[in-house]
């Protein structure tokens, strides 16, 4: 049986953020929703001290490449639908 690992890295701008506290509320909400809805690992990984920019990453494991791809694309859709942030860049990698 094969193991498939997927990662998704998303760079965001948070235009309405005036402080790190504002930014962290938006980022924390995104990460919590993704963890709860999709059972993935999630973390803020870059631009930690920049209040209008964030980089978040998500990871999941499955035995089916299609499941991993679908799940990470749904997470990207979730982030893109959030009115408090804008996706600047995204990178999806699948390792099997």
Question: What kind of feature is each model-predicted range?
Answer:
Residues 14-18, 61-64:
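Structural beta->alpha junctions
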Residues 60-96:
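C-terminal structural segments of small proteins and small subunits
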Residues 6-14, 20:
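Short glycine-/aliphatic-rich beta-strand segments at the starts of folded cytosolic domains
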